[in-house]
């Protein structure tokens, strides 16, 4: 094995963002535009990965989730930010009060502030065939994917008392709605009566499995009795668990969510957690956020982090460019320059004739570029 294989990377920045989906990238964009050095660490596991399209995001309606992240990455890079594909395994405090974000492979990122934008994991009930259709014919949010199953045979599998909460919304989308009270779940009698009066069919019996048709799509819901309910789509309200394992060394704890369905990270109005210098945004703080709301939350939290850093710099009379030691650390590591072209530069030179040299004074080495 070569010596290069054993090399580890160290990066120094103002802000390390753990999580590279809507909230994390939006925060990084804000920070980059404030001339803050920011590094996004992305494990590539967004909550909406199983979905083919995202909805109710103005300007991105119906686009694959990957469109948002790929464009977002380039926008962050165009303002000098870095995006690293990797997994944060531990975040700890250093002796000088900064943070060390340790990645798989022994790599590290050192930062003055850290943003947790790690999202959450949806935990589906243990029903045969359910997970295979998650993000397709099995949905949970009427706002995210309800319109796409309008007028279809929707079967809502109710696994907890809160499961009836979106039933009225699905009733607005279809007249063919069946609600199955799975495994003896307690349901509000008045709510059940109202839904029945509105035309929904209510079945009180456990579900055995989801039946898949020859076309690979959901065909029916099979009950423990053997009865089948024909279905085109399944609505389910999963439990959820926030991804905060990397922050255990800092003592970050999750609080029980008011719905009783999972946990979340509590923050103040600026996005700050109970750990000084550690912020959180997106689904890790609010599981109900759609992509647009998560991005907005990340953007606002990024702005609040910028305020925090600016106040600290003024208080310590730091120069805007940072002190000499910071720059030595930043450029002393292996391959500091990311190799990613500046987005503005690309736009300016795209129409120029090939074969010419351009001296752009990039400031990170590699100043002369052959077109």
Predicted segments — roles?
Residues 107-216:
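Predominantly flavin-linked oxidoreductase catalytic cores and closely associated redox partners
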Residues 70-103, 108-111, 174-262, 310-320:
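A Rossmann-like FAD-binding core segment of flavoenzymes
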Residues 3-4, 132-148, 240-292:
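FAD-site-proximal beta/loop scaffold in flavoenzymes
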Residues 317-353, 355-363:
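Conserved class I S-adenosyl-L-methionine
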Residues 283-317:
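A conserved FAD-binding loop/helix module that cradles the flavin
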Residues 7, 13-67, 164-185:
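Beta1-alpha1 glycine-rich phosphate/pyrophosphate-binding loop at the start
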Residues 366-371:
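Conserved SAM-binding loop of SAM-dependent methyltransferases across substrates and taxa
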């Amino acid at each position: 094995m070569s010596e290069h294989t054993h090399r580890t990377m160290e990066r120094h920045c103002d802000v390390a963002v753990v999580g590279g989906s809507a909230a994390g990238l939006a925060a990084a964009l804000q920070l980059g535009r404030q001339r803050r050095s920011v590094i996004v660490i992305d494990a590539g596991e967004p909550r909406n990965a199983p979905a083919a399209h995202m909805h109710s995001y103005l300007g991105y309606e119906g686009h694959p989730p990957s469109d948002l992240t790929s464009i977002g990455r380039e926008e962050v890079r165009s303002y000098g930010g870095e995006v690293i594909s990797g997994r944060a395994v531990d975040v700890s405090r250093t002796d000088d009060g900064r943070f060390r974000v340790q990645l798989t492979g022994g790599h590290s990122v050192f930062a003055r502030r850290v943003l947790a934008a790690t999202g959450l994991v949806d935990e589906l009930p243990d029903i045969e065939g359910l997970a295979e259709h998650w993000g397709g014919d099995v949905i949970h949010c009427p706002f995210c994917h309800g319109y796409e199953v309008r007028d279809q045979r929707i079967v809502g599998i109710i696994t907890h008392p809160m499961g009836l909460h979106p039933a009225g919304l699905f009733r607005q989308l279809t007249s063919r709605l069946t609600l199955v009270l799975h495994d003896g779940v307690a349901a509000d009698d008045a709510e059940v009566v109202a839904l029945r009066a509105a035309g929904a069919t209510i079945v009180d019996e456990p579900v055995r499995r989801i039946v898949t048709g020859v076309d690979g799509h959901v065909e029916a819901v099979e009950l423990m009795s053997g009865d089948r309910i024909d279905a085109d789509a399944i609505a389910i309200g999963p439990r959820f668990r926030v991804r905060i394992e990397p922050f255990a060394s800092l003592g970050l704890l999750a609080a029980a969510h008011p719905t009783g369905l999972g946990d979340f990270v509590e923050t103040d109005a600026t996005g700050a957690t109970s750990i000084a210098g550690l912020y959180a945004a997106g689904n890790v703080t609010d599981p109900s956020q759609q992509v647009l709301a998560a991005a907005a939350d990340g953007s606002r939290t990024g702005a609040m982090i910028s305020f925090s850093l600016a106040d600290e710099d003024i208080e310590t009379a730091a120069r805007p460019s940072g002190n000499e030691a910071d720059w030595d650390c930043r450029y002393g590591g292996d391959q500091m320059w990311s190799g990613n072209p500046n987005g503005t530069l690309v736009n300016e030179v795209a129409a120029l004739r090939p074969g010419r040299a351009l001296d752009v004074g990039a400031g990170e080495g590699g100043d002369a570029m052959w077109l």
